[in-house]
Amino acid sequence: MTNELFGVCPFVTAQKLLQGKWAILILHALNEGTKRFNDLERDIQITHATLSSQLKYMEKEGLVHRTVYPEVPPRVEYSLTAMGRRFAPVLDSIQVWGEEYIEFLKENRI
């Protein structure tokens, strides 16, 4: 997506970055701090292949930073970039809205 959306509606840009059901959950997990691949895989309950694909995409788009340590066995950690961290207030708003919506569903038995 990099550069192909230059000059397009910001909502379209955000939608394309966050498409799929895992992007927000990955951002939420990394917003809590640096994580290893297996930690993300376990915490989010996502398949290895899907997580790998999503992290590569998010790294390419500048939201996630991947750090490889020269150790044996290799250690790789993922964290949010400065741009990824700028999404934190949006995550907070989504969480508040989600909590309110859950209460709405309970009250209205939907």
Q: Which positions does each model-derived feature cover?
A:
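Canonical helix-turn-helix DNA-binding module
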Residues: 37-69, 73
